[in-house]
């Protein structure tokens, strides 16, 4: 700040005296500085608690055997020391008729509105192998217009004897999709609570996950024990992806566990240039997120990135 001094002789004398009184204390010996208590350090980088892959019948063909999935999941956990091997395992997809959920196991002779089944079980032998290998899986559905409570009971009622099963997941993009095409119907607080209670009625340790690319489709305030999965794609580069994950998705659900599903072919033009893409992307996310996270690579590009032990890759 600039100061304007007077020019009249008497005023100059007054000004000089005032200046002496103002600045004299500064010339005296400084007292000992007060010790300021150290501030708490900001939260450190996140811990990757789950690392693994997503499985779907449409994402990878031919569909690998159990040993190949185990190998791919093991490669993911090796990138993130201390992480638990995990799979997002899709057991129900939206049927060709968009009001129906297609469950990939037999009906047991029963019928349910907006639900169709397969004659043979696609998943039993995989889950049995995962039990032995110590791999954890969330069983996911694309619900369409089927009743969610019914889907939870059908899926967990069939597979909860497997110790590999740790929860149930809903891809909200396909929730009531015939009425809400392209985005699915958003999940409100009451609905999220009801779904979570239904999942935990099968096992209190089970966790519900909700998946979408936009946090506005998630419950506005209810968090419970829910895991929130982001499957955003079509980014121009890694930094825009990481920025969205760490500045939008993760803080919206802090301190809940968040999982990031990565490796889409739409992002391949830039991730294919990275050394060890799962590790590079996962580490970039981990360093900038406060809560526990999971890193899941999608099956669309699995054979290009992770070893499956199937011999020469196609």
Enumerate the predicted regions with their spans:
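Substrate-binding cleft/loops of secretory-pathway carbohydrate-active enzymes
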Residues: 150-156, 214-241
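Aromatic-lined substrate-binding rim segments of carbohydrate-active enzymes
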Residues: 86-90, 94-140, 188-191, 195-206
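Catalytic domains of carbohydrate-active enzymes, especially glycoside hydrolases
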Residues: 44-97
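An active-site-proximal structural segment forming one wall of the substrate-binding cleft
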Residues: 119-130, 144-167
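Substrate-binding cleft of secreted/luminal carbohydrate-active enzymes
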Residues: 233-314
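C-terminal motif of bacterial Sec signal peptides marking the signal peptidase cleavage site
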Residues: 24-26
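Aromatic-lined carbohydrate-recognition surfaces of secreted/lumenal glycan-active proteins
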Residues: 135-149, 196, 200-218, 257-265
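Active-site cleft segment of glycoside hydrolase catalytic domains centered on the general acid/base Glu
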Residues: 151-154, 158-163, 169-204
